[in-house]
């Protein structure tokens, strides 16, 4: 999150001031530095992150192609498929609806036919939480699109602070509040009053909704030019991040 905070400020500033090819170039340079840092320090990780059964990866899956190489190959083919689907937005919607319907139908059928009552209930709860998670992230990730456009068009900013730089608020709040939330969950867990996972999901959705409600409130205080004070945007990001 320190990297996300610094990178968002730098890349957005460079992109706005000198051109987005430089902004994206700086982002690419940062990722290369991050990869080099990881590869340099991987020797200190020991077996952490290693596959539990590494011998299985070396076994041949097709002719002389190992399981590991097959994973790389099919991963690359999926990149091509996803790229194609993105170009064909209409077909993408049909594809996602079809895959989603088939997947959910199979899971429900499997729950009814193969699972015990306890297992079935847990899987159905998991499906509900997945749906809540999809809703949360669909709203949260508006930060990179509609909320940035809203910031650019409808928020009073300083002379050098661009709309893209507001993306740094999320990692900033994470850095500042991570110790606070860690202490809260440690304390509540120790006392036996920590909220359950479904309750945490509910709180997250409520806070995302409150974040957008803050923008609605801010619109009531908009000036003649339709712009709102930056404090409303900051409060929205705070609510979304803590959610």
List PLM regions with ranges.
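Membrane-embedded alpha-helical bundles of multi-pass transporters/translocases
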Residues: 1-15, 26-27, 31-34, 125-139, ...
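Intracellular loop-helix junctions on the cytosolic face of multi-pass helical membrane proteins
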Residues: 12-159, 181, 185-193
